[in-house]
Structure formats: C-alpha cells, structure tokens
Amino acid sequence: LFLEVFLIHLCSVSNKNLGQQAAAYFHHQFIVNAAPSWKEGTISDLGTVIGGSTPSKSKPEYYTDNGIAWITPKDLSVDKSKFISHGADDITELGLRNSSASIMPAGTVLFSSRAPIGYIAIADGEVTTNQGFKSVVPNGNVGTAFVYYFLKNALPTIENMASGSTFKEISGSAMRTVPAVIPD
C-alpha cells in the first residue's frame, strides 16, 4: 500500500512538472519568439467566447445524475486535470431550454471568469457551464492546445482586466478584447 501511494504521488509530481514545462515552452516558442508573420489580435480571433448559465436551483426537474454535463468552477478546483467531462451535477434538457446555458463541443477551453479567475480545463466531451465561465471554442485555424496554453500565459493580463467590488470578474466583452498573438 505504501508503495502504491508513493507511486501515485510521484506520478502527480511528474505530471505537474510536465505541465509547467509545457507552459514555459509555449511562452518561449509562441509569445517570446512568435513568427514574424503572426499578427496581434484578440481572443476573439482565436475562438468564440461563450458564457455559461445556471438553471433555477428551485426546479429539481432541471437537474439529474446522468444528463448534460454542467461544469462549475468548484468542479475545476476539485479535479485539477487538464481535461474534464463531467462535474458534480448534470442538467436536463428542460434545464438547458429554460436557461441561457449553451452546449459547447469537445475541445472547448473552459476558463473560470470569477471566484476565482483562471481555472482552466479542456472539455473532453460536450458540456455546459455555469455563469462563472467565459469559455473559448477554438476557431478552425488554431488548436485547442494553443488556446489552452495561451489562456494560461495570459492569466495575469486577464486578471488585470477584471473588475468588481465584492470579487473580481472578467466580463464577456472584456474577455473578447484580451490581446492575443494570432498564428498564420
């Protein structure tokens, strides 16, 4: 048992280190040494920014155990992996229709926009999110991995663009204007 726990810990540390190396490599290759042909633009040039929504909690018929995946920032705080397919709750078709939640495709980069700003994961299937997200559905000209690492790299800029008195939040309109390097 001790050996199993030790190996799990070792894998966790190794995965964290690999993630840090990938982020550093991205910054060096695609931000510091971006190709001269790449243009300056905004996140909107990388993909479509989509907000989330919460169906009324007073309507139990809007929630189910095996429905449409519905992700909250809390889900990303508990599951710190790069990919996510389900959170603690799912919503029903009725809940989806009676809210402004949208189904986003696999490969969407989920980005928590408040409380806290900056939890990031990639949808490993179709998902919806609550209003604590400004997610990016990558355009065809850039890949999911590029958007994922771009958002990780842009986190300080995004945090500086956030506003709010009780807690900081980045609005959808502000998120769309975050400066970005656009690959050709």
Feature map (PLM): residue ranges:
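Specificity-determining recognition surfaces
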Residues: N153-A180
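Proline-centric
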Residues: L1-H9, K134-T144, G172-D184
